[in-house]
Amino acid sequence: MAVKISGVLKDGTGKPVQNCTIQLKAKRNSTTVVVNTLASENPDEAGRYSMDVEYGQYSVILLVEGFPPSHAGTITVYEDSQPGTLNDFLGAMTEDDARPEALRRFELMVEEVARNASAVAQNTAAAKKSASDASTSAREAATHAADAADSARAASTSAGQAASSAQSASSSAGTASTKATEASKSAAAAESSKSAAATSAGAAKTSETNASASLQSAATSASTATTKASEAATSARDAAASKEAAKSSETNASSSASSAASSATAAGNSAKAAKTSETNARSSETAAGQSASAAAGSKTAAASSASAASTSAGQASASATAAGKSAESAASSASTATTKAGEATEQASAAARSASAAKTSETNAKASETSAESSKTAAASSASSAASSASSASASKDEATRQASAAKSSATTASTKATEAAGSATAAAQSKSTAESAATRAETAAKRAEDIASAVALEDASTTKKGIVQLSSATNSTSETLAATPKAVKSAYDNAEKRLQKDQNGADIPDKGCFLNNINAVSKTDFADKRGMRYVRVNAPAGATSGKYYPVVVMRSAGSVSELASRVIITTATRTAGDPMNNCEFNGFVMPGGWTDRGRYAYGMFWQYQNNERAIHSIMMSNKGDDLRSVFYVDGAAFPVFAFIEDGLSISAPGADLVVNDTTYKFGATNPATECIAADVILDFKSGRGFYESHSLIVNDNLSCKKLFATDEIVARGGNQIRMIGGEYGALWRNDGAKTYLLLTNQGDVYGGWNTLRPFAIDNATGELVIGTKLSASLNGNALTATKLQTPRRVSGVEFDGSKDITLTAAHVAAFARRATDTYADADGGVPWNAESGAYNVTRSGDSYILVNFYTGVGSCRTLQMKAHYRNGGLFYRSSRDGYGFEEDWAEVYTSKNLPPESYPVGAPIPWPSDTVPSGYALMQGQAFDKSAYPKLAAAYPSGVIPDMRGWTIKGKPASGRAVLSQEQDGIKSHTHSASASSTDLGTKTTSSFDYGTKSTNNTGAHTHSVSGSTNSAGAHTHSLANVNTASANSGAGSASTRLSVVHNQNYATSSAGAHTHSLSGTAASAGAHAHTVGIGAHTHSVAIGSHGHTITVNAAGNAENTVKNIAFNYIVRLA
C-alpha cells in the first residue's frame, strides 16, 4: 500500500515555490517499483503537493523553471511509514546516517577483497586447465614429432621422384628437339602455309603463356614451402617463449589463456596457409593440364609449330627444374618441421601456450607434407606434359601436309590471331620475368633447407645445439638433455591440480591471516570489529551554553614520526531541519606539528545543512610546544557530538581552559582565533560547506569547478592567463610581459590558439590603449588623435572625413549673416524692401545705423526691417505688403529708456531728478507756451501758461469745492496751547514771639515693703529624648576606650528631679517716685502777605514756512 506524502513547498522566507516540479527517481528495485524509474508531481500556485508513494528508496529532484535541476536529498518509504510532508521524509534518519562513512568504506573494501578472492579462484582454475593442456600438448607433440619424421621421409622420396621426373623431362626435350628438326624440313615443303603459320604462331604464344603459368605456379609452390619453413621457425620461437611463459603460468593464468588463444590463431593461420599451398599445387596441376592441351592444339600448327613445340619443351624443362627445386624446398620445410617437432618435444613441460605451439607445428608439418605431395604431382604432370609435347611435335610432321590444304581457310583467322599474339607475347615476357624471379627465390629456399638439414644431422641436442633428445618420465630430474614424456607431464599436472583445486576457494590456505597480510587485505573480522577506527560520543562539558564555542580535543598518543596525519570524522547529531545544529560534519585529516619541522596542516570535507548554521567553528593548533592536539571548536548547543577516530587517538571535551606549555585553548570562546594563546586557526569554516585545506591546492592537471570564489587575488601565470568560452568562440586575456591583450579564437576552436584579430591591447609600460579592429560604440569625450573617418560624414552638405578643415558659408547652415551683407545710404531710402536677407550698414550724415532685413519673397508680408541707433539711441521697424514695398514709415519701438508716450499724459507734472530736461519736455516754471504748437498741452493748461511748481507741492483736490489749479497760500490749522508760570521766591516771613514759661508738679509717692518667709517647693521636672538615631562610636587612647551607642527612633524620659525652695528675708529697696505732665491747649498763629502779580513770557519757535521732510525735484511736463 502506498504512503501519502503531502504538504506545501516553501522557500526560506516562507513563500510558496511556484513553477516547480518534484521528481522521485527510484534508487533500487522494490516489490512494486523498478530502479531508475521517474515519478513527477507539480505543486499548485500555493505550493501544495500530494503524492501516493510506493515503498522504496527515491532520489528527490526539484526542477524550477529557469534553473538547473537541484538534488534535494534521498527519502526511504517503508511499509510502516506514516503519512507526512516531503520535509519529514528528507529529514528522517536513513540507514546511511546510522552507518558512519568509515563503516561504509569498510564494506566496500570487503566487497573488493571478495572480488579479488574470486579472481584468484578463477586464476587458479585457469592454471589447472593450463597444466592439463600442457600435458595434452606434450603427448600430441610426441605424436606430431613421429608424424613429422614420416613426412620428412615422404618428402625425401618425393624429391627423388621429382628429380627422376626432371630427367625424364630432359629426355623428352631432346626427343622434341629431334622432332623439331624434322618439322623444319616439313616446313620447307609447306611454303603455302605461311599465313597458317601466323595463326600457329599465335597458338604457340598461348602455349608459351601456359607453360609460363605452369612455371609460375611451381615457383609459387616453392615460395609457399619457403613460407612454411619461416612459419616453422616462428613456431620454434613461440615454443621457446612458451617455455618461459609456462614458468609463470601458475601466477598469471589469464596471460596463459591469452597466449593459448594467440597460438590457436596462429595454428588456424598455418592451416589456411597449407590450404593455400594445396590450392597453388592444384593450380599448377591445372596449368600443366592446360599446357598439355595447348601442346595438343599445336598439331594444327605449320612449320613454325615445330619451333613453338621446341620452345614449349624448353619451358617444360624449366618447369620441371622449378618443380625439382620446389620438391627440395618441401624437403627443407619437412626437415625444418622435424626440427621444430624435436624442439617441441624438448619443451613438453611448458604450460598452455606450448600445447598450442605444438599444434601449430603439427599443422605446418601436415601442410608441408601436403605441399610436397602436390609438388610431386605437379612435377609428374609437368613431365607428362613435356612427353606429350614431344609426341605432338612428332605428330606435327605428319599433320603438316594436312594443314597445308587448310592454310587458305586459316588465312582470315591468322590475321585476327596475329593481333592477339602480339598482346600474348607481351604478357609472356612479363610472366617469364616473374618466373625467373620465383625460381631464384626457390633456389635460395632450397639452399637454406640444405643448410638446416646438414646442421641438424643426427647429433644429440643440448641447450645450445639442435639434435636428437632422449625422453624421460622423471618428475624430479634437473637434467637439461632429457625431454619430458606425457607421464611426467601428467604427474606435474596432478600435483598442480591438487594444490589448486577448484572447489577449495582458499579453504586449503593454512594461515589465512598471513595470506591477507601478504596481499595487503583486511579481514572481515577486522571490519566487523571496526579495527583501525573507533566510534566515540563526546558529551557537552559542564557549563556549556549556546552561542559560545568549546574545544573538542583530538590527541595523539605521542609525537613521533610514526604518527603523522590522522583521519578524523566528527559530526553533530541529525536533528530537525530547522535546528541550526543539524548535521554539521568534518571528514578529513589533521596534522598538529607545533613548532616542529613537520608543520601543521588539515584538509577535508565540511558540511552544514545551511550556510549560516555553523555548529563547528574552526580547527585550532598550537604554534609552539604542543604537537599532539588538534582542537575542534564546537557550539555549546551542538553537543553531544560523534566521532570516528583512528586507533591511538583520544578525544575529549575539557571543562575549562586547556593549557599546554605556552598554548592556551580557551573554554567558551566567542572568537577562538583571537582568544586562544599561541594557537592558530588551521581551518575556519566561515565560508560554509565545501572542501577545505590549510595550504595551497596544487594540481598537475586541469582543475574544474562550477563557481570560483576568492577573498584575495587570483594569480594566473603563463602567457594565456584567462580563457573564456561561449558558443563557438573562445576569448583569452593574455599578458606577455610587454602588452596585455584581449584575443579571440577561430570559430569552432574554443580551446585552440588565437586568431589574427587584435581588438584590444594595452602597453604595460605606458598604459597606452590600442584598438586594432573597427570600433562601433556610442562614445562621449574627445579623441586625442584621429587621422581619418572610415566613412565620411556631411556637415550641412559639406563632406567631412576628419583629415582637413572644411568651410561652411551662411548658406550652408542657413545662417542669417556673419558680417555686413552690404552698405546703403539713408538719404537714398535705406535698404530696399526686396534686398537679400542680411545685416546692412546704413550711412547718414555724421554717423550710421545698423539695419536688419528679413526677406522671404512670399506671402503678404514679404519683408521686415529693423534699425537701431548707437548707444541705444532708438529702435524702429517697418514691413512691406505683397509686392508694393514699404507703405508706412518707421515705427519706434519703445524701451525702458524710451518709454512710450502714454506713460505720462501731456501736461502731467513729472518729478525729474535733474536740471537737464529731456527732449519734448519743459520745466514747470510759470512760463507761457504756444498753444497752437502744443495743443495737447493747451488742453491741459488753457491759460497757455505752465504752472510754476517751484516750492509748491501738489494737493489732491479737496471736497470743499476748490477749482483745479487753484492755489492755496500758507496757513496753520487752528489749535490750543498749555502754559505754566515760572517759580517765584516770596522770601522768609516770621511770627511774633510768645513765651509761656516752665510749669512743673511736686515729686511724691516714694515708699518701701518688708519681706519674710520662704517660697513653695517647685522646680521638679523631667526631660524626654525623641527620634534619636542609632549610632555607635569608639574612642580611646592607649589601652582604654569608650563606646557610645544611641538607638534610632526610640523615646526616652529622665527621672523627675530639681524640686527646691527659696528663703526670703530683708527689706525691699525704695521705689515708686514719679512725676506728672502739664498740658497746654491747642492754638494758632496767622501770617499776612501783601497783594502782588506775576509776568508769563512765550518765546517764538518754527521755520520760515510750513513744510514737511522733503527732497527737491524739478517738475517737468511733456509738451506733446
Swiss-Prot record:
Lineage summary: Bacteria, Pseudomonadati, Pseudomonadota, Gammaproteobacteria, Enterobacterales
Family statement: Belongs to the tail fiber family.
Residue ranges with Low complexity bias: 221-239, 248-395, 402-442
UniProt GO molecular function: structural molecule activity
Species in which this protein is naturally found: Escherichia coli (strain K12)
UniProt xrefs under PANTHER family: PROPHAGE SIDE TAIL FIBER PROTEIN HOMOLOG STFQ-RELATED (PTHR35191:SF1)
Designated name of the protein: Prophage side tail fiber protein homolog StfR
Region (Disordered): 129-154, 221-442, 960-1021
Keywords: Repeat
Polar residues: bias regions: 985-1021
Domain of life: Bacteria
